[in-house]
From Swiss-Prot:
It holds the Pfam family DALR_1. It comes from Coxiella burnetii (strain CbuG_Q212). InterPro entries: aa-tRNA-synth_I_CS, Arg-tRNA-ligase, Arg-tRNA-synth_N, Arg-tRNA-synth_N_sf, ArgRS_core, DALR_anticod-bd, Rossmann-like_a/b/a_fold, tRNAsynth_Ia_anticodon-bd. One of its GO terms (molecular function) is ATP binding. This is Arginine--tRNA ligase. SUPFAM superfamilies: Anticodon-binding domain of a subclass of class I aminoacyl-tRNA synthetases, Arginyl-tRNA synthetase (ArgRS), N-terminal 'additional' domain, Nucleotidylyl transferase. GO terms for cellular component: cytoplasm.
Amino acid sequence: MIDLSTMKQQIATLLNQAIERLKTKGVLKPEVTPVIKITHTTDPQHGDFATNLALTLSKAAGMSPHALAEKIVEALPPSGQITEVEIAGPGFINFFVTEGSYQTIVSSILKAGKDYGRSEMGKGQRVHMEYVSANPTGPLHVGHGRGAAYGACVANLLNAAGFEVHREYYVNDAGRQMGILALSVWIRYLQGYEASIELPKNAYQGEYIIDIAEALKAKYGKQFYHSVESIQAKIPEEIDSNADPEAYLDAWVTAQKDLLGPKDFECVFQAALDSILNDIKNDLEEFGVTYDDWFPESRLVREGLIQEGLDLLTKHGYVYEKNGAQWFRATALGDEKDRVLIRKNGLPTYFAADVAYHLHKFNQGYDQIIDIFGADHHGYIPRIRGFLKGLGKAPEKLHILLVQFAILYRGNEKVSMSTRGGTFVTLRELRHEVGNDAARFFYIMRKPDQHLDFDLELAKSQSNENPVYYIQYAHARICSVFRQLKTTQKNWDRPRGMENLSLLSTNYEKELLATLGRYPEVIKRAAMNYAPHLLAHYLQTLANQFHTYYNAERFLIEDDNLRNARLNLINAVQQIIRNGLTLLGVSAPEEM
């Protein structure tokens, strides 16, 4: 595969050979080991590639950067792909490559097709990725959508770079919030029989709770019914619902468990969990986000993984008892305070579950483990790295990526969200309003740790201001050229076009060729830096260059040789746009 990174490697080889020659001549000492950095220039007048090698080695050589640059250039071996080498400024070395070097990029793209840009950079390396993992207590909201789009794109990029990626969703099916969910459904169920019963203000309020309750009533009738009086009798009188609403809520959960008993409580609990989890799965699948595994927290208890983690931390001396609870000595490993692992009632904390889950991940032998969290989890990072050290695991294998929640604007008005309050805008509602493509692209077009103001009106607009529309329109325009071709007496001879790529000599064409050649390098950089926004920006640049070219030139011309060369070029642009959009989870429509 020919691309600009290949050309950079070839230039680096030439520079290494020049350095070795200078060592032989005594200009540089034998122990000098240069780090050769080559960049692609933005101004064609300064060539195609540049290096600051002379500036970095001037001190070791005992001469000015410009003087050393002259000696490096003199020592460069000849190359059939380099037409000119010049020294600029204080000692930068600029390289001009042959036009043929760029033109071979077109043939490489058309030959590789959908595989152009893929590499074996990560061959043999296994990566575990966990993302979204929202509590199954309600539908996904627009905040979760950004983590979903980002995680899916990073997984796609790593896969394109040759890594074997395992995608996982951690299902928190064993925590306090799940008890509150089951309670919320049960009270809505009871309201079908007694209107006087009130839902505690901190319970889940959304309409989806009523839907689950009605389904429960339709299937089981009055099996779970208990009177208001019997419930109130279970609530301690000293608990004030206004003074301590959370304690009041916990008392309700305890009352529910006592009155229903284990079997019926599990039935209500499972109905709520299954309904919401199925909705989450369907929502994500419709959004193009799929997983290899949905890992339930309850499995950690069932398979003894929490106890395994506790035993390992104890073995390494990081567990102690205080006030009837078992604590992790987190401060000894860089955290701000020690953390409770097992409460005095014998129940594990969320923290204990996280220890067990990460121990399980590390025990699978992955080369990289990636956790994608909301930015509000930033304080959790030292905690996780601390317990990994306590477990005797290598913290450097873990990469925690933080994603800022997207802020949705309807007009100039900010939309607030609260899962328990039921006032949130769901991911499904967003997708239905702006479409999957706009949602996927808008979510990832900024760095993940930057705040994202999601402009609904812009996302729906069919204008050049809408970046995803602009990119898709470039693809559709190219498709229209080939449809128009079929209505004429002209033909497209791809082999003949390959033979005449040298005719692609306008500045528009040279610019497009150079940008096409950058695509494989963009994929590698985006994968290694977990940065899909780099690919989004690249596609915007490519689309802009194509639209400029489209407006300036004609393609279905009488000159057979030039026509075929240009059709090959725009076919290559079409392929790269389609490849890039696919990695971002965005469609490439043929008509718009």
